A protein has these predicted regions:
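Mixed-charge interfacial surface used for oligomerization/domain docking
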Residues: 1, 7-170
Length: 170
């Protein structure tokens, strides 16, 4: 038995799929355990919320900061560092700009390396489909997928989450 901290909720399925591919390729348990950190290091996660309300209610951000953010229509683009800590990667004003920023982040990553992309949503199907359509036209995509976020993440963010998971190819 081996325990491996993925450090993020939303991209865990990507790692499970990669492990499945390694098993199919005949890799042993020990070889897969050895490879896991390199898989994790190739994954970046970015997401944006439609509202800050649920972060305020959950105590993830202060009430004053959240209310000011809502009034200014600030949309933080949230990412996760290598230690699993969530941080504000960027801030934009308005939903449309936040969706465009996610597409820009995907574009910039794909210009650096061929990658697999997952477009994820939590109660934002139409926005998610639009983001998927935009990103799917970008070069250097080895694989693109679309789906729902983990309910564990949705509990903290509420409806309206959009996210992208970028995994650089080997």
């Amino acid at each position: 038995t081996q325990i491996f901290d993925l450090a993020f909720i939303s991209a865990s399925c990507a790692i499970v799929v990669e492990c499945g591919k390694l098993i199919a390729a005949g890799k042993s348990f020990d070889e897969i355990v050895e490879i896991l950190p390199s898989i994790q290091s190739r994954i970046k996660v970015y997401y944006v919320l439609e509202t800050l309300t649920y972060l305020i209610k959950g105590g993830r951000i202060g009430k004053v900061a959240g209310i000011v953010g809502e009034l200014l229509k600030l949309k933080p683009i949230i990412s996760i560092n290598d230690e699993g800590t969530y941080y504000t990667y960027s801030k934009v004003r308005g939903r449309n700009k936040s969706i465009a920023k996610l597409a820009e982040i995907a574009h910039d990553a794909l210009m650096k390396a061929k990658s697999k992309i997952w477009v994820l949503h939590g109660g934002a199907l139409e926005d998610g489909k639009a983001l998927y359509d935009t990103i799917s036209k970008l070069p250097n995509i080895s694989e693109i997928n679309f789906g729902d976020i983990s309910p564990v993440l949705g509990v903290h963010t509420g409806p309206g989450l959009l996210g992208i998971v970028i995994m650089k190819d080997n």
